[in-house]
Amino acid sequence: MGESVLSRLGQWISNTPLRSLDQAYEAALRIKAIEDQYFQGGSIGSNGQHGQNVSRYFQIQLRRQLRQIDLRLAEFRASSAFSRLPDPEQNGSGPTSAQDKAQQLHAAEANVSESSSENSENGRQRRDLSILEKLQFIDQVTSRYKRPTRKSQPISASISTSPEPLERPEQPTSTQPSSSNVSVKAGSGNGAAPVASKAAILPRSILRTASQIRRELSSQAEEELIQEYREARTRTLVSIRFLLLLAILPLLTQILSKNFLFGPLVDHLQQREPAIVALSHEFQEKALTEFEFFKERMEFERALHHQSPEWDLESADQLSMKAEELLKKYSRRNSEGLKNILADLLSLLVFGWLIFVGREEIEVLKSFLDRLIYGLSDSAKAFIIILFTDVFVGYHSPHGWEVLLGNLAAHLGVPENRDFIYGFIATFPVFLDTLFKYWIFRYLNRVSPSSVATYRAMND
């Protein structure tokens, strides 16, 4: 029985990549069916034949299917690293001609919304397609909707929509003329010479202004502006969603794994094998110190009441109860630290998995942060820099570091080491202050000199 369960579990894990790819392929088929049935094969929302409520319904369905495709493809990429995939060109006995493949796709698209009795036949047709064919079909369907979230789009969009300070590092005058001269020499004919002379004579700001006026007078200016706003909104939504995932998912993993996985496991081991979760040397010293203080206080009270210095049965029972109480107290602290360490490691693995899977979202997040930071005024940038430097490396920062390290030691279940805390406070803020100054001198002074001037004026 146990072997059959393990074999089924192993088979389910090994089939996870293909199952995720099939689910993403089904979502792409649903989008394609809506396009063919209601939009004559065009993109959803491209024509104005439908009313506002109908268009809104189709947009909701589109976003739902695109979200399903993103999640299943991310699951496909993550599970492919741990499972062995079949040959991408030999995944089943599929059709060999392009006409048969087209007929098969058409049949699957036509039956995508049929009842559950026909789902097995559609599933067989989908399995007949190879992995590359499914991925190609998904890319073909989502290409017109997923452009803002591609890896190259956020970079180009962020460069085109970023403020002026981002372009300053790309304006050295010593290398630009040489590259233009090389292009003139490499070209054939005399048509490139006026272009080089024009670029050398006229400032770039005039050329940018002329191109901006030409874009504004274009007949497609409104559509381009709307498209830019849509792309900016998409980048913002993707960035906020990814930040929430990075913050919430590891935190939930830490809490749930500690309370429902590692907590019962450590408690069971502690009850069964107490030596596995034994008290550390520091906790033993603290328990003995507290026990000696309790014992001396009892002797002091007995001396005040002129009682016999010999211990009676009641006093011995009190000492025994106090020893058991101290043992439970420090054993709980020791086991809580072990639970926190295991849960923190698991949440760190989840965080690393999110970073590995969401590489495209990281590119979008970079462009979003660039627009957000460089869109601030110089005084706002200087205020943020002063706030961070004063909090982490300022005059009152040692007290904050001391509290932070003390809470970290309690979280890990280890006693506070004052020598380590004082040594850390004496070295790490100094290194952090040097890093801040180097960043301001090397990067911020080159990108936004006005912010550096404002920062120095406010700091003085």
UniProtKB/Swiss-Prot annotation:
Residue stretches of biased makeup (Low complexity): 107-120, 171-184
Topology in membrane: Multi-pass membrane protein
Record carries keyword Transferase: no
Spans annotated as Disordered: 82-128, 143-190
Keyword Transmembrane: yes
GO CC terms of this entry: plasma membrane
Subcellular location: Cell inner membrane
Annotated signal peptide: none
Keywords carried by this UniProt record: Cell inner membrane, Cell membrane, Hydrogen ion transport, Ion transport, Membrane, Transmembrane, Transmembrane helix, Transport
Top-level taxon of the source organism: Bacteria
Compositional bias segments (type: Polar residues): 90-102, 151-163
GO MF, one example: proton transmembrane transporter activity
Known role: Required for H(+) efflux immediately after light irradiation to form a rapid H(+) concentration gradient across the thylakoid membranes. Together with PxcL, contributes to transient H(+) uptake following dark to light transition.
Protein name (record): Proton extrusion protein PxcA
Lineage of the organism: Bacteria, Bacillati, Cyanobacteriota, Cyanophyceae, Synechococcales
The encoding gene: pxcA
